[in-house]
Amino acid sequence: MEIANALVGNINAGDKPFTGTVSAQSMIIPAYKYPTGGWETDTYWDSVHKAGGGKVPYAVINPASGVGEKANSDYVKLINDNDAVGIKNLGYIRTVYQTRPIEEVKAEVDKYLELYGKDKIHGYFFDEISALNNHATAYMAELYRYVKEKAGNKLVMANPGTHITDAIAPYADIFVTSEVSAKTYLNNYEQPKSAFENDPANAHRIMHMIHDVTPDQYDAVIKASRERNA
């Protein structure tokens, strides 16, 4: 599968095409390459759409470091194109490690549905997540309940980029629990302490974002991610 910039259960290989075998794992595409513009960008999204929702179930949509004030026509097209091939769109929202006023975050949840359509936005990617204290956990719990009740049971993905506690584990459907270089991932990986991350039954709820992956590291990174329940 030739996809660049993908989270696979999770792998991000920069701008190099990913060609490893990922059986029983999946990818999430961060939509950081602008949807239209140049030949390279068009080729990127053509590759994503050819792969389809069977191999790339989700794409993270980030029109303006978040939803922005008005709909972006290029992202409207991208969102529709993703939807047409079975790729679910996740709206990108920062929480600033749960210090951003939660009403602002909730307003962004609503704004994605207003601007891009409740039937086209399938969930949310909450970035800059902390799991370090009771406040952070309570914040995430409130946000999780809001999405499920107000937005219509949309998917919640949270990106702490590091290991989480068992206390916060119930408050996202998927967690990104590692965001490191391939070198660190393969040589200096810190083992998780939570029961959640150490349970293979939770592999479908755990993703790892590994950057600076060279082709000769693909198989080793994939093997390691499987062993680490991602």
Regions found by a protein language model. Give the residues of each.
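Glycan-processing catalytic domains of CAZymes
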Residues: 4, 10-230
